Curated annotation (Swiss-Prot):
(S)-2,3,4,5-tetrahydrodipicolinate binds at H157, G166, T167. The lineage of its organism: Bacteria, Pseudomonadati, Pseudomonadota, Gammaproteobacteria, Pasteurellales. It comes from the Bacteria. NCBIfam families: dapB. The active site is at H156 (proton donor/acceptor), K160 (proton donor). This is 4-hydroxy-tetrahydrodipicolinate reductase.
Length: 270
């Protein structure tokens, strides 16, 4: 049975890549494509929007009207929009893949609560490589973390609105959890002026925003005389789109619960 996928934010950079990924993936098809109310893209053929040619599915701004045309929703938009789409999915009992970042604690709690009724994959990054890096960071932190300085450097395009990136924060959380630290108290997100010496248990973050950088993350485990760097560089958003579609296929057999790409890729059994 073919899984029908709905994509919100279909006119955005990720939305167009998601349409392409769905089009080129066996076992799935695009069921509906959505944009915000008032968007000039409403009425446009979704395939033409994504550069794959006409596919006969028009972009719409009404999820309710299209509810019978898709089984699962993929959302890479903004936090306020995602929470609205999440409420719709709970009401209609449709599963959702969330790639949006920048949620506050209240919104994260709403996602956790929704997962009692539907199945959700919520991840900061859908790249297979990045999620493998998460596991490598845990292993590096276990061996080196208590004896070195840890710094996370991330770079993205000039249009990204949140900082540090959700992926950088997830990297910090994986490291902090491994070391038994609380990232909220041990994370350092800016340094300016006379800051004093670096504390040994800090996890530092540095952010770069420039041009069209898709996404780059490097973590330093720096000791006196040597430094280990673990890096991931994305050259195309298609890696995130393919991962999200893979997550949607995996999620289609679930009834409820909150999952991430560690579950999708079965990384805990490595």
């Amino acid at each position: 049975m073919t899984l029908k996928i709905g994509i919100v934010g279909s006119g955005g950079r990720m939305g167009r890549q998601l349409i392409q990924a769905v089009y080129h993936t066996e076992g799935v098809e695009l069921g509906a494509a959505f944009e915000r109310v008032g968007s000039s893209l409403v009425g446009t053929d979704a395939g033409e929007l994504a550069g794959i040619g006409r596919i006969g599915i028009k972009v719409t701004d009404n999820l309710t009207q299209e509810k019978g045309n898709f089984d699962i929703l993929i959302d890479f938009t903004r936090p306020e929009g995602t929470i609205q789409h999440l409420a719709f999915c709970v009401e209609q009992h449709k599963n959702i893949v969330i790639g949006t970042t920048g949620f506050d604690d209240q919104s994260k709690q709403a996602i956790q609560q929704a997962a009692q009724n539907i199945a959700i994959v919520f991840a900061s990054n859908y790249s297979v490589g990045v999620n493998l890096v998460f596991k490598l960071l845990e292993k590096a932190a276990k061996v080196m973390g208590d004896y070195c300085d840890i710094e996370i450097i991330e770079a993205h395009h000039r249009h990204k609105v949140d900082a540090p990136s959700g992926t950088a924060l997830s990297m910090g959380e994986h490291i902090a959890k491994t070391l038994g630290r609380d990232l909220k108290t041990h994370g350092v997100f800016s340094r300016e002026g006379i800051t004093g010496e670096r504390k040994p248990d800090e996890i530092g973050f540095s952010t770069i925003r420039a041009a069209d950088v898709v996404g780059e993350h490097t973590v330093w485990f720096a000791d006196i005389g040597e430094r280990v760097e673990i890096s991931h560089k994305a050259s195309s958003r298609m890696t995130f789109a393919n991962g999200a579609v893979r997550a949607a296929k995996w999620l289609s057999t679930k009834q409820e619960g909150l999952f991430d790409m560690t579950d999708v890729l079965d990384l805990n059994n490595l």
